Amino acid sequence: IELHPYLPQHALVSFCQSRDIHVTAYSPLGSGGSKPCLLEDEEVKKVAGKVGKSVAQVVLKWGIERGTSVIPKTVKVERLKENSMLDFDIDREDMEKISSLGVEKRYVPDFWNSGCFDE
């Protein structure tokens, strides 16, 4: 499921979790070549500065803290290492800020267009 702070799909995640269906976030970092760029979001940058981590690490940790798996794509060894260093916490207030950015941006085309959850 395409899932990141710009497309949190709260209803779909809640539906799945209420039925013990584990959710895996596809494209959890958004898409670097598309606008708006999640990794340039000012609110997420503030949280990253606060916890001393990269924006990508904060976004991945946000996904994990929500109870989802994240599968970021990278071809760079240094990013692969960075993406696995998620041994920090994001406080509740910052989790809520990230969860409510309100952008609603889908980066991956919705081929099925099911519209099940109106998101």
Task: Report the location of each language-model feature.
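Beta/alpha (TIM)-barrel catalytic core signal, keyed to glycine-rich beta->alpha loops juxtaposed to Asp/Glu
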Residues: 1-119
